């Protein structure tokens, strides 16, 4: 139509959904439910097929199998590093999107991306432009289809580990009832009663240990010998 879309809500049934960070799978974010039956779900991860299956929650497995969702995996992290893009995976993943979603003819979409990259980065040098072009070409073909096992249709999560009486403390209940649902972006489903133990604003200490985001692909390490050498040279 001619009227702009001003809807303040997310699309809930999309033809294509992509998970750009594998930590969202581990945390149980319910992204798969936003894929319409027969749609496409792309996951950026460094996992093998077996590792991917191990990390997927049972509820997501059931939805994928029962709604014929097409699942594709891509390691944009490694690809970006190999073509000289460092940690910048967005170009690789955008290229994969155009190749899979088919909202435009793939060849046209990739050429548009290359033209935009040339225009945007030519001032930074030909090497930067070439790296972007390589990322575009790589992303268009580097994904692989994951064959969904038939038993995913009836998948069940492993039985939760029962906490001992000693560890069934207020902090454990707080994490289970509040922090975990909120952390996987499911906080809107919590009833008011879940917050009643904290109606006075008091919360148990120590919960930060359970709120690790886990979104970093790599972490820095400190070379104490190098630091000592530099410090000695400065004296």
At which residue positions do the language-model features occur?
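Active-site cofactor/cluster-binding pocket
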Residues: 1-180
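Non-ligating segments of multi-cofactor redox enzymes
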Residues: 149-221, 225
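Conserved small/polar residues in nucleotide/adenosyl-binding loops
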Residues: 227-234
């Amino acid at each position: 139509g001619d009227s702009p879309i001003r809807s303040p809500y997310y699309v809930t049934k999309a033809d294509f959904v992509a998970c750009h960070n594998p930590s969202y799978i581990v945390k149980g974010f319910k992204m798969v439910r936003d894929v319409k039956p027969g749609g496409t779900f792309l996951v950026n991860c460094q996992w093998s097929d077996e590792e991917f299956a191990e990390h997927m929650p049972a509820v997501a497995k059931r939805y994928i199998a029962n709604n014929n969702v097409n699942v594709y995996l891509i390691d944009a992290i490694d690809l970006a590093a190999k073509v000289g893009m460092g940690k910048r995976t967005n170009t690789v993943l955008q290229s994969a999107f155009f190749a899979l979603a088919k909202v435009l003819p793939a060849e046209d979409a990739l050429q548009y991306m290359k033209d935009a990259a040339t225009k945007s980065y030519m001032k930074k040098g030909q090497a930067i432009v070439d790296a972007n072009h390589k990322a575009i070409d790589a992303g268009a073909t580097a994904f692989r289809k994951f064959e969904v096992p038939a038993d995913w249709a009836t998948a069940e999560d492993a039985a939760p580990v029962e906490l001992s009486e000693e560890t069934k403390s207020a902090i454990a209940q707080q994490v289970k009832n509040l922090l975990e649902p909120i952390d996987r972006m499911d906080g809107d489903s919590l009833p008011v009663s879940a917050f009643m133990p904290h109606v006075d604003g008091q919360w148990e200490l120590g919960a930060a240990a359970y709120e690790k985001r886990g979104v970093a692909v790599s972490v820095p390490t400190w070379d104490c010998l190098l630091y000592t050498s530099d410090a000695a040279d400065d004296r």
